[in-house]
Swiss-Prot record:
Region (Disordered): 1-119, 350-396
Protein name as annotated: DDB1- and CUL4-associated factor 10
A GO cellular-component term linked to this record: Cul4-RING E3 ubiquitin ligase complex
Family annotation (Pfam families): WD40
Organism encoding this protein: Homo sapiens (Human)
Disulfide links within the chain: none
Composition skew (Basic and acidic residues), residue ranges: 370-381
Biological process, per Gene Ontology: protein ubiquitination
Length: 559
């Protein structure tokens, strides 16, 4: 396992019996001075050493010192280098502590090494490399990341499935099952398709899954998944019984655009163009539906996401605002409807923030009037929590993300994704005139402040890139890779793989002081129409993309 000689850690000390190393008897015979009066177990105290005069590096000592690499043996007589009683002892070379892989039996009578060029030096070199974080013994995933980067760098279009626009329409969303065994396709013409991503074989078509466009698909586990549609409903499905729906959920009054799921509480969270965020208790679902409650309301709602640990909820709007609910508690908010406003950043005026009395939550609007619930929510903030420096639960932050090169205030945030480890958020923004598009990465700063107004924003722009301005009026869904090191973004008639640097490092390892461009790792073009959605497989080195003309393409490494 280790490229060492017979004295490597874990090796047998007897295997090196023929090596030319001094034995304890030879070392003892070489000693010329009287033995030290101190012996193991003696209770004596060394006097404090006096100030030493400076000595040139490498100057010879008064008595021969042991060779580099030799360690003293317990119970062996002291050499002549020991000073007489009452005299200060010269400083001894520091003893290096053996690593955890060194076993006691390998420390036999030869010690750990016998010189600078012996196996001991190689051992200490290996320990140094390991302490610096190099090699598989510290972080095996580092080499795995290098391998994945190499694989994605050699990725090519592997297969494609053409879906007739007459029967299926455009591809609006793609979603893999958590185990990567099923790829689901949300189609424009009321259908959901299921494929085997490994063989590219069609498994099942859920004809008339909805009565209008299917917008989003979300897996709850390896067998249950949910779909939402412009028909204002959400449907639950079971992969083991696809002939009928598990149940249909009614509660929205307009197009339902995306679905989130809290695995800890088993609560389903949906959002739609009616401005409502609704929570569904899937623990008590029946054929007629399941209990639900309006959790939040805001105007111009586009997308809603939960962080991986479900500690934050992010909501993007077509007016350029990003709403962040900190210290999220979905279960508590079913009874408590107060949302203290922590801060408003880069808003046009203080009157832009109002609270909807029907949902007891603040919303962004152009109305100059305030509802009384906004002031009452601040009164409900615990004074004790303010004194102790603790933010209230479900506290709201309103942010206008900084976009480099924006010509006018207020960009439409059309797509919203979160880093798999919750470090950052990924936004795709378009200008008000719809003539510019860009992808931006924002790092989450420290937790939300306690004071209602703070000069610091919790999001910081770290990376950005300009996108192709094609397919106006359609939302382009981008995504992070499962490890969070790469981004797959629709780009014209294909996709681009983007990284934070050329080595595809993790975000925390390459955070710039100022916003810097994303690096293009690879560009892939295999469609004949505008790509609307793309997705990484959670288990395989595979990417899927879907376009406006109904074509689904799969990308895999090719050597």
């Amino acid at each position: 396992m280790f490229p060492f000689g017979p004295h490597s850690p874990g090796g047998d000390g007897s295997a090196g019996a023929g090596a030319e190393e001094p034995t304890p008897h030879e070392g003892q015979a070489a000693a010329t001075g009287p033995p030290s009066p101190l012996h193991p177990g003696a209770d004596a105290t060394h006097p404090p050493p006096p100030a030493r005069s400076p000595r040139r590096p490498g100057a010879p000592s008064l008595s021969p010192a042991p060779r580099s690499g030799e360690l003293g043996l317990p119970g062996a007589p002291e050499s002549s280098t020991a000073s007489a009683p009452g005299e200060p002892s010269p400083p001894s070379p520091p003893c290096r502590r053996p690593g955890p892989d060194c076993r006691a039996k390998s420390r036999g009578r030869h010690g750990l090494g016998a010189g600078l060029g012996g196996p001991g030096a190689r051992l200490f070199g290996w320990l140094k490399e390991r302490s610096l974080g190099r090699g598989l013994f510290v972080d095996p995933a580092r080499d795995n990341f290098r391998t994945m980067t190499s694989l994605y760098g050699s990725i090519h279009p592997a297969d494609s499935v053409y879906l007739s626009t007459r029967t299926h329409g455009a591809v609006f969303n793609l979603e893999y099952s958590p185990d990567g065994s099923v790829l689901t396709v949300a189609c424009e013409q009321t259908e959901v398709l299921l494929f085997d991503p490994i063989s590219s074989k069609h498994i099942k078509t859920l004809s008339e899954a909805h009565e209008d466009c299917v917008n989003n698909i979300r897996f709850l586990d390896n067998r249950l998944f949910a779909t939402c549609s412009d028909d204002t409903t959400i449907a639950l499905w079971d992969l083991r019984k696809l002939n009928t729906k598990v149940c249909t959920l009614h509660g929205h009054t307009s197009w339902v655009k995306n679905i989130e799921y809290d695995t800890n509480t088993r609560l389903l969270v949906t959002s739609g163009f009616d401005g409502n965020v609704i929570i569904w208790d899937t623990n008590r679902y029946t054929e007629d539906g399941c209990p639900h409650k309006k959790f939040f309301h805001t105007r111009f709602l586009m997308r809603m996401r939960l962080t991986p640990d479900c500690s934050k909820m992010l909501i993007s709007t077509s007016s350029g605002y990003l709403l962040i609910l900190h210290d999220l508690d979905l279960t508590k908010s079913l009874e408590v409807g107060s949302y203290p406003i922590l801060r408003a950043r880069r808003t046009t005026s203080s009157s832009d923030l109002t609270t909807s009395s029907s949902s007891s939550g603040p919303r962004v609007s152009g109305s100059p009037c305030h509802h009384s619930d906004s002031n009452s929510s601040e009164k409900h903030m615990s004074r004790a929590s303010q004194r102790e420096g603790v933010s209230p639960r479900n506290s709201l932050e309103v942010v206008t993300p900084e976009v480099l090169g924006e010509s006018d205030h207020g960009n439409c945030i059309t797509s919203l994704q979160l880093h798999p480890k919750g470090w950052a958020t990924l936004l795709r923004c378009s200008s008000n005139s719809d003539d510019e598009e860009c992808t931006c990465v924002y790092e989450f700063q420290e937790g939300a402040p306690v004071r209602p107004v703070s000069p610091r924003c919790s999001l910081r722009l770290t990376h950005y890139i300009e996108e192709a301005n094609v397919g106006r009026g359609y939302i382009k869904e981008l995504c992070f890779s499962p490890d969070g090191r790469m981004i797959s973004s629709p780009h014209g008639y294909g996709i681009r793989l983007l990284g934070f640097d050329k080595q595809c490092s993790e975000l925390v390892d390459c955070l710039p002081k100022e916003a810097s461009p994303l690096r293009v790792i690879r560009s892939l073009y295999s469609h004949n129409d505008v790509v609307l959605t793309t997705k990484f497989s959670p288990t395989h080195c595979q990417i899927a993309s879907g376009c406006l003309s109904g074509r689904v393409s799969l990308y895999q490494p090719k050597f």
